[in-house]
Amino acid sequence: MAGKVRSLVWTGDSLRLIDQTKLPAVFEFVECRRWQEVSDAIRTMKVRGAPAIGAAAAYGVVLGAMECRGETSERLIAAVAAVIKELAQTRPTAVNLFWALERMENILKAQEGKPAAAVIEALRLEAEAVAAEDVKACRAIGTNGASLIKNGDGVLTICNAGALATVDYGTALGVIRAAFVQGTKFHVYAAETRPFLQGARLTAWELVEEGIPAILICDNMAGWLMQQGRVQLVIVGADRIAANGDTANKIGTYTFAVLAHHHGIPFYVAAPLSTIDISLDSGREIPIEERAAEEVTHLLGHRIAPEGIGVYNPAFDVTPAHLIAGIITEVGIIEPPYRENLAEALKKR
């Protein structure tokens, strides 16, 4: 899929998104012509993955501005500022969303007094830059991390940190793609990732599309595979990385990190620098999104749990930095001590 079809495409007057809720059964695009449709797509996970929702939100701002093209510059800027605030409420954990919206807000503030058409064009150019930079970063992440995968390795990953989770190519799957293209002989264990099944539906689909040898497993099989010596490396994505290296990612990631540590298996995070939130001292400060009970009690529209049962459904967990061997970024692999090295890496952005 990578390089062939992007997860999101700007058409000039709309944002086309792959509807990730329908994969792998149906490959279908959602056409967003209003910012509210982008907001809904992010909330309902038609588009998901930290870098992808950041880029989608940036284009959502452009759509919000285009809806006000007949207004005065002053009114347009006020309306777009309100749109940015609304888009920031869609999902709380992925920092790329807020990073992209902050960029759009900075551009908006710089347009004061300029004609409405100029404001819209400046916002469009910034959204295009956000998307282009993500593609470039993911390609570099793949290149920088590919050598970690050796011939004969079993590589475990969770959720979907591939082309679908970014504008194109992917973070954790970007590393896997790059190693595969370089000719390394290995196979991937894709954890299904309950309850939303991003691993089974999305990662497995990407791997099959690319022809990368892969095996789908249930999440609770990971420890047994490690004990049997079938896993030599774990690579995951990230939704937010605190200043000390603590990393929020899809629920279940922390479990894999603990298991990997117990079995002496290197555990790596792959993420662009935009995922690093230096304003948060540690993972304790990362807000964790809780999603609807129906994601746990229902499967493909059918109830699988009894009525009346309580449900706890956090979308993310936090892996402590001491369990992470390295963070693969577009400027290289960052290793401990994370507080100093992450701050230094951000200077290269």
How would you name each of these model-derived features?
Residues T44-G60, R91, L97, T157-D168, ...:
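Conserved phosphate/anionic-ligand binding catalytic regions in large, soluble enzymes, centered on
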